[in-house]
Structures are given as structure tokens and as C-alpha cells.
């Protein structure tokens, strides 16, 4: 299933000195396939070559996972030091829910607009939610913050939204003993079948 946002059809009220509404970010199906506090399993995020975040891990005070696909925009300054994470090289996320009564999961791929996407993940107890969920968030308008004396000022990109259409593909997965390995295999197959990658495993000796 592909879910898309046609950016040229987004209606905004262009900001003035006193009024106006502009869109900055879009979270795509944030609670799709979210797991509850009673569920067992984990989320898969592309931190480096891949990492798992266990459901209900009780890290309530830890910072929720957030990392920009292909790294941060270096043209925008940093006000705070980011948390220690590996760079995200692949626009793919997933989750596996397993237990006595269920064994299923999914893979999601940012197919269009991934260069302005970030990967987010929270566990139950973080950010006032009882769910474990991971999703893509797309920044459609650049913003920056700076200080002038004691005043904090935030500036936004003017004009219309210049980002391409945003598309995320969702792929349900179900099999006995489903694991993150199956998510990795599903993504490999997607790259071979849809992106023209070549399978070189037969040449390995």
C-alpha cells in the first residue's frame, strides 16, 4: 500500500507580520501498526546498518529516537548538540510484534521525498503516549532559529512548498518466527525488483 501527499495541492495561508499559517512538517501515519503496552516485539530503525528498539523498554526519560535520512542539513546551524546516533543511510523502517497469540510485522519505505525525511520512534511512556510506534516525518519548509539579545527568533522559508510529492510504501509481513532478518530480506528484494539492484550473492566465494 502506497500513501502519498501531493505537495502542490497543499493549501496554506502565507504568513505576514501578524497572521498566516504555513506548513512545516508532515508526519506520515504516525500510529500505523502501533503496538500497545501489552504487546511484545520491537521496532527496526536504520541507525547505521540497522538497530532495534524493544517495545515497552521502560526508558521513559530517554530522548525519543529522531534521525534525518542521509544526515542533517549542514546549511542549518545546530542550537544543541544532537544525541549520539549513527547516520541513517536507508529510508526504511519496520516493526515486529510477536507473542503467544500473534506474529506479524511490517516494513515501510520512503519512496519519494526521502531527502527531506526523518525517522522517528517512541516507546510507551515517552511523549505522553502508551504506544510503541515508528514513522517518517517530512520537513516541507526549511526553518532556522537564532538569538538576538534575549530574544529567540525563528525564521521560515518563504514562498510555496518546493519539496516533491511524499510517498511511503507499507508492506505487511506475516510468517512463523518473523524477525528483523525478514525485514532486511524484504528490503533487499524491493531494491532488486523495483530499483534494478543486482544480486551478487552467487559470486561470493
Tell where the protein language model's regions lie, with residue ranges.
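Carbohydrate-recognition beta-sandwich/jelly-roll modules
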Residues: 1-205
Amino acid at each position: 500500500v502506497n500513501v502519498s501527499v501531493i505537495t502542490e495541492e497543499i493549501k496554506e495561508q502565507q504568513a505576514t507580520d501578524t497572521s498566516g499559517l504555513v506548513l512545516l512538517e508532515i508526519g506520515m501515519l504516525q500510529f500505523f501498526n502501533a503496538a500497545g503496552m501489552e504487546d511484545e516485539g520491537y521496532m527496526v530503525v536504520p541507525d547505521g546498518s540497522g538497530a532495534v528498539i524493544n517495545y515497552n523498554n521502560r526508558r521513559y526519560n530517554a530522548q525519543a529516537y529522531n534521525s534525518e535520512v542521509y544526515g542533517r542539513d549542514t546549511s542549518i546551524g545546530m542550537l544543541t548538540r544532537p544525541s549520539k546516533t549513527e547516520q541513517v543511510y536507508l529510508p526504511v523502517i519496520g516493526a515486529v510484534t510477536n507473542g503467544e497469540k500473534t506474529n506479524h510485522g511490517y516494513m515501510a519505505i520512503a519512496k519519494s521525498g526521502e531527502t527531506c525525511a526523518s525517522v522517528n520512534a517512541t516507546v510507551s511512556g515517552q511523549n505522553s503516549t502508551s504506544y510503541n510506534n515508528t514513522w517518517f516525518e517530512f520537513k516541507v519548509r526549511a526553518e532556522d532559529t537564532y538569538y538576538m539579545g534575549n530574544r529567540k527568533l525563528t525564521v521560515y522559508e518563504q514562498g510555496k512548498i518546493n519539496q516533491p510529492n511524499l510517498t511511503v510504501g507499507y508492506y505487511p509481513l506475516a510468517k512463523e518466527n518473523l524477525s528483523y532478518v525478514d525485514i532486511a530480506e524484504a528490503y533487499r528484494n524491493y531494491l532488486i525488483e523495483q530499483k534494478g539492484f543486482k544480486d551478487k550473492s552467487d559470486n561470493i566465494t
